[in-house]
């Protein structure tokens, strides 16, 4: 997250670093500094772990001869997981109770081997939990870009987040 040093008014954080519900500011855009260059080994491992034999992800010869891309595409669910994972250190490590769902998930441009992913998260909503007084629901809009700033993935996600413990 690109923020100048911590101020006296910085929101309280969990000992592991995540923001409590009260620290999420609707409208704030977090630009995550953590990046990741993806590899074909990432693609192979993920595809094998998820039992996905799609040649579009794992077969260079097939992709070179039979696709418009000419090379394997990174598995879109790997891309989705990476995008959300990159946000965790800055925002939710130690404070997420559960993911409640994702909507409007899109992959407008393919991600390829050796692309470097960087991400942003915009806080687009939050509300108190009706059933749990120690938590709230935060809505996040995650976006992932490649090294050329082409949008490769986005989704809106609702997360169940802990409130700051009472002293």
What are these regions (language model features)?
Residues 2-100, 163-167:
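Hot-dog-fold acyl-thioester-processing enzymes
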Residues 2-26, 107-116, 120-167:
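HotDog/MaoC-like acyl-thioester-processing domains
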């Amino acid at each position: 997250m690109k923020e100048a040093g911590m101020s006296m008014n910085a929101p309280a954080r969990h000992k592991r670093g995540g923001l409590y519900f009260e620290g999420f500011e609707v409208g704030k855009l977090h630009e995550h500094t953590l990046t990741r260059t993806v590899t074909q080994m990432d693609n192979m491992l993920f595809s094998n772990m998820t039992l996905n034999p799609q040649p579009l992800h794992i077969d260079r010869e097939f992709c070179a001869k039979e696709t418009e891309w000419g090379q394997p595409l990174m598995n879109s669910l790997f891309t989705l997981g990476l995008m959300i994972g990159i946000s965790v250190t800055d925002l939710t490590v130690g404070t997420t109770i559960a993911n409640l769902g994702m909507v409007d998930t899109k992959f407008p441009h393919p991600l390829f081997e050796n692309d470097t992913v960087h991400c942003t998260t915009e806080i687009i909503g939050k509300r108190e939990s009706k059933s749990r007084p120690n938590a709230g629901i935060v809505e996040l809009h995650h976006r992932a870009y490649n090294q050329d700033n082409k949008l490769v993935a986005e989704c809106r996600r609702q997360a169940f987040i802990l409130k700051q413990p009472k002293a």
